[in-house]
Amino acid sequence: MGFGREGRSSYRLLRNYMPEQKLYILDSNPTISEDAELTSDSHVELQVGPSMTDQLGTFDIILKAPGVPARLFPENFDTGRITSQTDLFLRHYGNQVIGVTGTKGKSTTSSLIHHILASSGFHTMLVGNIGLPPFEAIGDITPGSRIVMELSSHQLQFISRSPHIAILLNIFQEHLDHYGSYEEYQQAKLNIGRYQQKNDYFLYSEDNSLLQSLLAGEKSGGHRLLPYSLTDKPENGVFRRERKVFLHTDSGIREIMDATAGIPIPGEHNFSNAMVAAAACYLAGASEEQINRGVQSFKG
């Protein structure tokens, strides 16, 4: 459902594994009826334009692209039949994924994490909202790959598995065009940590007042909740002391980034992004030396 960049990659992957499976492609744009790749496929049926949603109730599985608004589904629709590239990818590779979401800052943070890990010698790929559609990365994934995913609220809305390392930067009252309410948008963002498993990590900004409120008293279901803050808070989590960053977990306090000489991306908001990127990379196996080198060589 939705035949843009991600929808096309979904079609190609499914067709590669199931060359004669009947597929229905739904899109609001009627011009896809002229797409040469689709017109040459006798096992495809197109449902386009205003009538694209007329037969939603007849499908067993709906693979929804992130650009398709959830409001197109009828009230009380069985959402258990809705999945996505993000959902299926996380079900299979979630234990290798560092996922990043937030109303602001997610592209910078995702790119910085990818740069630190790649410059440290890890096999790293960037997928999701920036980088490749998830399905296009599958052929290159190895057991040692670190997969960085930038995730929008639309990509998170119908997932059933969260990333191994989840990062929630902030939530602000923006990008609400696909949602019936601000609360619905908030809940979609919170999905990034909602389905974590034992020994996963959920990093979230304690400096964002809404996140503090939403996650106050949150009980870990085996995963580790790690707030981060620009203030000097040595409780469990990530904190700044002068221009150094520390990670405090059950195993003690470790310095993970030394920014005494500054960082190449200006502003307190970017220092916060660099803090959580450093923590994610440390949890993914990078050393403090590798983190410092990666941060200093980042071009933004």
Predicted segments, located by residue:
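Residues in the short beta-alpha loop(s) of Rossmann-like NAD(P)-binding domains
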Residues: 4, 29-31, 130, 207-208, ...
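Short beta-strand "acidic-cap" motif of Rossmann-like dinucleotide-binding folds
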Residues: 22-27, 125-126, 148, 227
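Adenine nucleotide phosphate-binding catalytic loops in nucleotide-utilizing enzymes
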Residues: 3, 181-186, 223-300
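Hydrophobic residues within alpha-helices
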Residues: 10, 109-113, 280
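Flexible, glycine-rich phosphate/dinucleotide-binding loops
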Residues: 7, 32, 91, 133, ...
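Phosphate-binding loop of NTP-binding sites
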Residues: 15, 54-59, 66-223, 239
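N-terminal leader/targeting and accessory segments in enzymes
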Residues: 1-84, 266, 286-289, 300
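Alpha-helix C-terminal capping segments
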Residues: 16-18, 116-120, 279-285
